[in-house]
Regions:
Chain A
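Glycine-rich, Arg-bearing micro-motifs that act as flexible, cationic patches
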Residues: 109-134
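Small/aliphatic-rich secondary-structure junction motif
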Residues: 2-53, 86
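Short, flexible loop segments at boundaries between secondary-structure elements
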Residues: 138-144
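Short secondary-structure boundary segments
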Residues: 37, 113-115, 144
């Protein structure tokens, strides 16, 4: 059975560094990659009726955008390097959804970049990598 | 285009207000007779003893009882499942990003939790005595079943537009449901009738009544009808309110709507918490207040028409507040993409519960305990929201101010929701086009302003009449389509039981 690595990706530089780092590891151990793009979304927000009616369209657009602008180009460059790559786009709480996806794909490890925010900012807005480290049942590699 | 419409709206209002002094009064004398006549037609009454039972109220009560029994007390047996659905236990993570059950519920609730919960209850208690509260709760309980049926149908028969958005609601299930049963012509007729009704009704219950009561409370906290500089400036308050509403629904300034939608749930909680505090500050009046509710319900002491009079008032105000039987929530719930229409019906059960059984009852107790502790407090000519405000002020003197703010927020969010309901009726009739959209929205804003210029009595008559008028075709359709809902419901719950429909979380 091939090993699977899950890579959290959002198009930022940090996430690309994480993806590159994961690719090196995957090549070395002939593992395959799952690139996961999580769109921050909560089922408990409050919407106007008009927003609800248009929600399905918006969702399709969001997924489409993540797929074509981030996942497709990135996964292509890794495929060219000879690594097996699958992609996932999902809505939800970033860290929670990454853990769910890792479980679904039976991933052995999660790779994630970090933004390197100041302590104040992290205190205010939290950090996906930090939360993920606390929640994940499998090893997490945080790539600076 | 937007600007032109906005400008036109402003101009017409400005020129009207230019006649200045006594303008509010002129509007009043103009509208009062129309309202009175319209109310008489819709509320055709059958005299029973001293009481007069409006046919339409009977129609709603019989419907609610029928659906409760026919659906096997779905309002009780579906309750736990409703909470599980809202909590997201059955939500497939692959569908994350679509409208969740919670969101559909929250949207529908912010449409129903409005001034009716604060001011409408006071009206019920003034006219129907404390006993009206009992019937209000009863109506809420039975209304849960009606809501279940209409919201299930709304999802089942909605239209999916080519662009991926959805339109649903009674006009769609009436048309499609009847034509499925071979009554195409009749289906088209009632569908259109409903659409017209919701267009007009939206201008009353979801609009003028809201802006009027928000204004009343505003005047109240700025010094009362005698002192406040705003007392005879209904047109000014109305124009401001209309402009804010216009900026959201016509101008597309989503941020205002978003802020409101976020504030309203907290306002509702804030309101309930303070109401409970006020009730408990009068703790020695609580047993008597509760006893009054029960004895009032049975004897109807001091109420025109006795117990029956109290019942009629209670039911009337309950429907006005939770909208069960009107079909409006069904429009909001149709936006949820689900393979199981029944799930939306089950979730919608919670709306009359939250709206009527929880919030209205709390308001009734605030007034009830105050009335026990100080019998004459409300006899100073206070009506509607002013009475509720007075009951709060007895214990917490500064509360009318946050109450005014809450009232404005409630009014505003209800108006936003109803502008959508009305618009859906309008587009059903005239097709989905931007120009048509804008025309309706402009009319809607005009009525927001108008609502602040007329007195409560005629407003209640008009809005009640419009709203109750559309209950007639809606409930008629529900009777016809109830067997379909029943079949779907049984199949759905059987699959839950057999484990075919599984929970994703909390297992």
């Amino acid at each position: 059975m091939t090993t699977t690595y899950l890579v959290a990706i959002d198009g930022s530089e940090g996430s690309l560094r994480a993806a590159n780092f994961a690719t090196e590891r995957a090549k070395a151990s002939s593992a395959k990659l799952v690139l996961a793009y999580v769109i921050e979304w909560s089922p408990y927000s409050f919407n106007t009726p008009e927003e609800n009616a248009e929600r399905h369209q918006r969702r399709e657009e969001e997924i489409e955008r993540a797929q074509t602008t981030v996942l497709d180009p990135v996964s292509q460059t890794f495929r060219d390097k000879g690594v097996g790559v699958a992609t996932e786009v999902r809505h939800g709480h970033a860290a929670e959804t990454l853990v769910d996806l890792a479980k679904e794909h039976g991933a052995a490890q999660i790779f994630i970049g970090r933004k390197g925010e100041s302590r104040m900012k992290t205190l205010l807005f939290g950090s996906v990598a930090g939360t993920l480290v606390q929640m994940s049942p499998i090893p997490v590699t945080v790539v600076p | 285009m937007k600007r032109i419409l906005l400008a036109a709206l402003m101009l017409s209002l400005m020129s009207a207000s230019a006649h200045a002094a006594g303008f509010d009064e002129t509007i009043n004398t103009m509208t009062a007779p129309i309202a009175e006549w319209f109310g008489k037609v819709v509320f055709f009454k059958i005299p029973i003893g001293d009481a007069a039972l409006p046919l339409v109220v009977l129609w709603l009560v019989v419907g609610a009882i029928f659906f409760t029994v026919y659906m096997g007390f779905i309002n009780i047996r579906g309750f736990k499942h409703a909470i599980e659905l809202v909590r997201g236990d059955y939500a497939n993570p692959k569908d994350a990003g679509e409208v969740s059950h919670f969101q559909a519920l929250a949207t529908a609730v912010s449409g129903t939790v409005g001034i009716g919960n604060i001011g409408g209850v006071a009206v019920a208690v003034t006219v129907g005595g404390p006993g009206a509260t009992f019937w209000l709760i009863m109506a809420g309980f039975l209304g849960m079943s009606t809501k279940f049926v209409e919201c299930t149908l709304g999802v089942k028969y909605r239209n999916e537009n080519p662009d991926g958005s959805v339109s649903g609601g009674p006009m769609y299930y009436l048309r499609k449901g009847f034509s499925e049963r071979g009554m195409e012509g009749f289906g088209k007729f009632v569908g259109a009738f409903y659409a017209i009704g919701i267009c007009l009704g939206a201008l009353g219950i979801g609009n003028m009544f809201q802006s009027n009561q928000a204004f009343v409370q505003f005047v109240n906290v700025t010094g009362g009808t005698q002192e406040s500089w705003f007392a005879d400036k209904g047109w000014l308050f109305g124009i401001v309110m209309a402009l804010v509403v216009a900026s959201v629904i016509i101008g597309g300034i989503k941020s205002i709507a978003r802020v409101t939608e976020k504030i309203v749930p907290f306002m509702a909680i804030f309101y309930c918490v303070f109401a409970l505090i006020v009730i408990f500050m009068n703790y020695d009046a609580i047993p008597q207040a509760i006893a009054n509710i029960f004895t009032g319900a049975m004897t109807g002491e001091g109420v025109v028409g006795g117990a029956l009079g109290a019942l009629i008032i209670g039911f009337q105000r309950a429907v006005f507040s939770n909208e069960a039987g009107i079909g409006s929530a069904s429009i909001a719930h149709s936006a949820v993409r689900t393979n199981e229409p029944v799930t939306e019906g089950v979730v919608s059960l919670l709306e009359p519960f939250i709206d009527t059984i929880v919030i209205c009852t709390i308001t009734a107790l605030v007034i009830g305990t105050a009335a026990v502790a100080e019998p004459g407090f409300a006899l100073v000519g206070q009506q509607g929201i002013a009475m509720t405000s007075a009951a709060f002020a007895r214990e917490i003197s500064w509360f009318p101010i946050p109450l005014a703010f809450a009232a404005m927020m409630f009014a505003f969010s209800t108006m936003i929701s109803w502008s959508y309901y009305g618009l859906k009726g309008w587009t059903y009739l005239f097709g989905e086009s931007q120009t048509m959209d804008r025309i309706y929205k402009a009319i809607f804003c005009f009525f927001v302003a108008l609502g602040c210029m007329v007195q409560l009595g005629p407003i209640l008559d008009i809005s009640d009449a419009f709203v109750f008028l559309i209950c007639v075709p809606n409930i008629l359709g529900l009777y016809f389509l109830a067997p379909i809902v029943k079949r779907e419901t049984e199949s759905y719950f059987a699959r839950i039981k057999s484990g075919e429909i599984k929970k994703y979380k909390h297992t």
